[in-house]
Amino acid sequence: MASSAAAIVSGSPFRSSPLIHNHHASRYAPGSISVVSLPRQVSRRGLSVKSGLIEPDGGKLMNLVVEESRRRVMKHEAETVPARIKLNRVDLEWVHVLSEGWASPLKGFMRQSEFLQTLHFNSFRLEDGSVVNMSVPIVLAIDDDQKFRIGDSNQVTLVDSVGNPIAILNDIEIYKHPKEERIARTWGTTARGLPYAEEAITKAGNWLIGGDLQVLEPIKYNDGLDRFRLSPSQLREEFIRRGADAVFAFQLRNPVHNGHALLMTDTRRRLLEMGYKNPVLLLNPLGGFTKADDVPLSWRMRQHEKVLEDGVLDPETTVVSIFPSPMLYAGPTEVQWHAKARINAGANFYIVGRDPAGMGHPTEKRDLYDADHGKKVLSMAPGLERLNILPFKVAAYDKTQGKMAFFDPSRSQDFLFISGTKMRGLAKKKENPPDGFMCPSGWKVLVDYYDSLSAETGNGRVSEAVASA
């Protein structure tokens, strides 16, 4: 697996158009994490974004949540639809992603034409001939019995684990689920042990069902973290309110160490040098399914709060918001999805580290992907031409300075690369990393998490909240 060394910009990316500047942007108390007052959910299914922010894919930000005035009627309709599909946790996370427009211009689970284009081209073509990036299938699997029960129906109701209606899927299309090909093309291997494939594909049904989604209510988790779950439309409102003239996004699924912070703060410095006046960081931790040895979201968010409280990142120029997508660990294929979703959230700059969305090979002692392929693929990916992918160099722990710094190959003996495995081992033993690797209060959260494992679960993983409407 890739080490926890970070990556940092070293060259000038293509410069995009400036964003609207709001001279009345609010200020934030130092040392506190930014929690914004959210606007009302946008009620139209297709919101034409006319602000100075980068336009979402397809020019419209999809909002698939039913208008509040129509929810009672639609809930009644959902109860009367005879065909029902029970959603699992990952299915619900994809409903959340789709409902808020992260996957715009998708209007629901993929039909076969969208699925095939995604699988073979990592993109699909719109009616006007333009191409948008889409590298991971967003699909809903059903089994033979469910397909039989649906019959000739044109719509189905999607329900949660206890039968509560979540959404209606309209104008449906059912087609074969080519599991082996899907796994091979998404991960580049069919080896056993791929976390997402084991969770959501290999045991799933032999059919896929696509259609247009009508989500009955905004998806909530009621886990104390919903205040951090800003939709793309809400994030865009916040960036305008802050007067951002550039938005740079950082995706992560791990605790923030000082190498990450160096990456983010130096990126802002370089954007200021380029002439931007108020670049804003979107720190966008992944909030959906993750593999068993990743730190759960609730603990990561506690750690992120400490990072801002300790001033490692500036809360006045940082927006912390949860990205609701499941994690596929599909390397260069998946990192395109991560980048595309941030366009829809308003980001025009995207930072990548080493081995983005990567993991160790499930059956061999090596990394599954080349650590540099993610950044290279992003610079060439169809449909991502509008997004500025920042070139970078590696950062590691500089023993001579006692802090994370940019790696200097001329004195490589002075640098220490602390892998994720090494970091977890230290935390489990309640040992401290080298001074300057992570802020002490953030490290304590990590130690407390590993200390809590046996007490809270006995199976090595703290349970996570499940979405509900």
Curated annotation (Swiss-Prot):
- Give the subcellular location: Plastid, Chloroplast stroma
Output the Gene Ontology terms for molecular function.
ATP binding; sulfate adenylyltransferase (ATP) activity
> What GO cellular component is one of the record's annotations?
mitochondrion
Annotated pathway, please? Answer: Sulfur metabolism; hydrogen sulfide biosynthesis; sulfite from sulfate: step 1/3
Entry-linked Pfam families: ATP-sulfurylase, PUA_2
Q: EC number(s) per UniProt? A: 2.7.7.4
Q: Give the GO terms filed under biological process for this record.
A: hydrogen sulfide biosynthetic process; sulfate assimilation
Cite the entry's keywords alphabetically. Answer: ATP-binding, Chloroplast, Nucleotide-binding, Nucleotidyltransferase, Plastid, Transferase, Transit peptide
Q: Which reaction does it catalyse?
A: sulfate + ATP + H(+) = adenosine 5'-phosphosulfate + diphosphate
Found in which tissues?
Expressed in roots and leaves.
Query: What role does it play?
Result: Sulfate adenylyltransferase. Catalyzes the first step of the sulfate assimilation pathway.
NCBIfam families listed in its UniProt record:
sopT
**Which family, according to the similarity comment?**
Belongs to the sulfate adenylyltransferase family.
How does this chain assemble?
Homotetramer.
Q: What is this protein called?
A: ATP sulfurylase 4, chloroplastic
Question: From what organism does this protein derive?
Answer: Arabidopsis thaliana
The taxonomy runs: Eukaryota, Viridiplantae, Streptophyta, Embryophyta, Tracheophyta
